């Protein structure tokens, strides 16, 4: 007996293939940068971009396999979780940037705890959303699907709250270091202003994407956003591709410290 399709529309092969190609190229670019700079804490960018590549590839393949549950689960899970991995590297970069500028006293949270607190919260969001996606993909009833959507919604809301708290830490640090620059901010090799600007851009894009997902799941499976394909590409795929493009110029290995400076790759 043939399985019933979980797709409310026929996934586009063309758009899916385009996004798969874009994310594959971005994965290669990030991998090259990673090994050239040795910034191993940026590995979540690579893993997340691989998730996106496989996820959109699965969407494209689903055009001719709409009844395939494995393909449906694969694309739903990987595309949902990839931005959480991007956020993990964003969180880790702020702490290293604070250390590089010698401005630890300007952070409202001890620098050694920034990564632990926010990446820990990120892992929690990952687990919640993964559980919700699993429940949703395997549900055979409306009640089961609603439970899965509610769990995902909870994970997304927690992620937004954590991200807003992170932005508060970044903004306060930014304000303090601009009003009272440290000696290390004069070092031309430490492009802290550019990196903070890019951090804000990336954070806003990820937040917009998360808000889109909240609205999408809050509206339910019969809502416009889940019933149509274009929103996921405009408010998720394109935004996350921009995030990866921006962050490809953001590897802190380019800010090579002197021997007496704090290593940006340290925890």
Identify what each model region corresponds to.
Residues 3-5, 137-146, 182, 221-223:
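Membrane-interface helix termini and inter-helical loops of multi-pass transporters
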Residues 13-17, 72-84, 129, 146-163, ...:
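Extracellular loop 3-seventh transmembrane helix
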Residues 24-31, 80-107, 123-137, 161-178, ...:
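Cytoplasm-facing ends of alpha-helical transmembrane segments in multi-pass membrane proteins
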Residues 38-39, 65, 141, 228, ...:
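Short, solvent-exposed helix-helix connector turns and helix-capping sites enriched
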């Amino acid at each position: 007996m043939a399985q019933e399709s979980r797709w409310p529309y026929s996934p586009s092969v063309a758009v899916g293939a385009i996004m798969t190609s874009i994310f594959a190229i971005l994965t290669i670019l990030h991998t090259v940068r990673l090994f050239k700079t040795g910034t191993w804490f940026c590995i979540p960018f690579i893993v997340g971009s691989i998730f996106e590549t496989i996820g959109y590839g699965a969407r494209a393949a689903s055009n001719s396999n709409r009844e395939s549950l494995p393909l449906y689960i694969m694309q739903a899970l990987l595309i949902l979780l990839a931005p959480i991995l991007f956020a993990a590297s964003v969180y880790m970069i702020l702490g290293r940037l604070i250390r590089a500028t010698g401005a630890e006293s300007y952070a409202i949270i001890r620098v050694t705890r920034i990564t632990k607190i926010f990446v820990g919260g990120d892992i929690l969001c990952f687990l919640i959303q993964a559980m919700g996606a699993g429940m949703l993909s395997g549900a055979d009833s409306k009640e089961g699907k609603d439970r899965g959507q509610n769990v995902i919604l909870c994970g997304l809301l927690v992620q937004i709250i954590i991200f807003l708290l992170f932005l508060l830490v970044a903004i306060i640090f930014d304000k303090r270091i601009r009003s009272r620059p440290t000696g290390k901010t004069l070092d031309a090799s430490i492009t802290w202003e550019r990196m903070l600007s890019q951090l804000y851009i990336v954070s806003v894009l990820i937040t917009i994407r998360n808000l889109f997902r909240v609205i999408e799941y809050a509206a339910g499976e019969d809502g416009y956003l889940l019933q149509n394909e274009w929103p996921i590409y405009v408010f998720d795929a394109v935004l996350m591709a921009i995030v990866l493009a921006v962050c490809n110029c953001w590897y802190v290995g380019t800010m090579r410290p002197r021997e007496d400076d704090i290593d940006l790759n340290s925890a």
